[in-house]
């Protein structure tokens, strides 16, 4: 496996990561007791295989159904936990709800510290405002950093390039998860700006949806 420096996080991240969106029995937030041994064994077998081939970065999200709870149980049962664990939490107008969501994810993943914590889906100006306002989501995450509960702070986005540039220019983030593909390079300027700020750049779903077909206009 090849690795790259992930911007100012200074983490060495593999060029291929293990996405956890499909590590789930359901999109609903089920109790672990509702997940069969067969379903859980699939997750743990994949984690062991990923470890064998050097995929040391695993990412998931609050919105990925049972993914966090299944990964958390998997981390307890496999031989080696991935070096880099990332989860993503949606922005919220109420910082205390956002903090509660972060703490719930840490509990589900059964780890002492989340290496990469992304604000999930900064797709509108309102989302960005909730993230960066005084006393907002970023301030919550800074306090959790001081408690060593999270590492680097990033954001994921399906938003327009102009919005992503605005978020990067706040200089509040260490990395960004965004779309960029061989046949759709609208975010090239965004990536150049991210490089200027030394942000890590993570490409979202490079082989899913319509991204390997002709360009289609998105609406947000």
Segments and roles (model prediction):
Residues 1-83:
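N-terminal binding-site loop/beta-alpha segment at the start of enzyme catalytic domains
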Residues 51, 191-196:
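Anion (oxyanion) recognition and catalysis
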Residues 86-88, 179, 202-206:
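Generic beta-sheet signal
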Residues 70-74, 166-167, 189-193:
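A short acidic, amphipathic alpha-helical/loop segment
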């Amino acid at each position: 496996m090849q690795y790259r420096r992930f911007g100012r996080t200074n983490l060495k991240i593999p060029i291929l990561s293990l996405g956890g969106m499909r590590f789930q029995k359901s999109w609903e937030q089920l109790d672990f007791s509702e997940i069969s041994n067969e379903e859980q064994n699939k997750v743990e077998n994949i984690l062991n295989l990923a470890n064998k081939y050097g995929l040391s970065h695993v990412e998931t999200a609050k919105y990925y159904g049972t993914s966090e709870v299944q990964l958390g149980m998997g981390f307890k049962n496999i031989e080696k936990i991935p070096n880099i664990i990332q989860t993503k939490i949606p922005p919220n107008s109420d910082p205390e709800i956002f903090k509660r969501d972060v703490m719930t994810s840490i509990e589900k993943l059964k780890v002492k510290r989340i290496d990469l914590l992304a604000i999930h889906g900064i797709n509108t100006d309102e989302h960005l405002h909730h993230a960066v306002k005084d006393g907002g989501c970023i301030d919550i995450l800074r306090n959790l950093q001081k408690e060593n509960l999270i590492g680097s702070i990033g954001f994921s986005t399906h938003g327009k390039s102009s919005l992503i540039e605005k978020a990067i220019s706040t200089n509040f983030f260490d990395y960004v998860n965004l779309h960029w593909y061989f046949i759709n390079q609208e975010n090239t300027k965004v990536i150049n700006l991210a490089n200027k700020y030394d942000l890590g750049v993570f490409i979202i779903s490079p082989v899913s949806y319509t991204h390997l077909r002709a360009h289609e206009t998105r609406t947000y």
